[in-house]
Amino acid sequence: MQILEHGQEHGRTLLFFPCTAEPVWAFDDTVAQLSQSWHIFQVVYDGHQPEYPGDFTSVEQTVDAVISYLKSCGISQLDGAYGCSMGGACLTRMLALGEMTIGRAIIDGGITPYQLPFLVRKLLLARDVLSFKMAANSRKVLEAAF
């Protein structure tokens, strides 16, 4: 994992956790604008960019590495953080750990695990899969949805 920094001369801090398979350039315009007044930390997951090879292993390991990196840079709190999809799961984990204060957090479509017994989770999975298959195979359902 790598963390790219932009706008290091600014005091306000903002962390970006991207979604799965999100290339670095996807945040280029946003980072260019925000780095004019914020110190931006942009997370690049292992295996998500040719320059940063490796395999993404886990949300937990990523969050631990991000916290460790920020603390090594003298950052003890963040003014803001953004996480999209898998990045939302990373941000949710970071908030749950409570190891670093985050002033504002935006969780965009964060994936979170069900806190239910195994059998109930499997039944919910079966329901979801069946629902998607029925919707995908039924013109009437698709027309009603859209």
Language-model features, listed with the residues they occupy:
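Conserved catalytic-core motifs of eukaryotic protein kinase domains, centered on the activation segment
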Residues: 27-28, 51-56, 116-118
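Conserved HGGG/HGGXW glycine-rich cap/lid loop of the alpha/beta-hydrolase fold
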Residues: 4-50
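Flexible "cap/lid" loop of the alpha/beta hydrolase fold
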Residues: 96, 102-133
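Gly/Ala-rich beta-loop-alpha elbow adjacent to hydrolase catalytic centers
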Residues: 83-91
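Active-site signature of alpha/beta-hydrolase-fold catalytic machinery across serine-
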Residues: 29, 93-97
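Active-site loop/oxyanion-hole signature of alpha/beta-hydrolase fold enzymes
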Residues: 41-82
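Helix-loop "lid/cap" segments that line or gate small-molecule binding pockets
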Residues: 136-146
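Structural signature of beta-strand start/N-cap positions in the alpha/beta core
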Residues: 13, 39, 80, 102-104
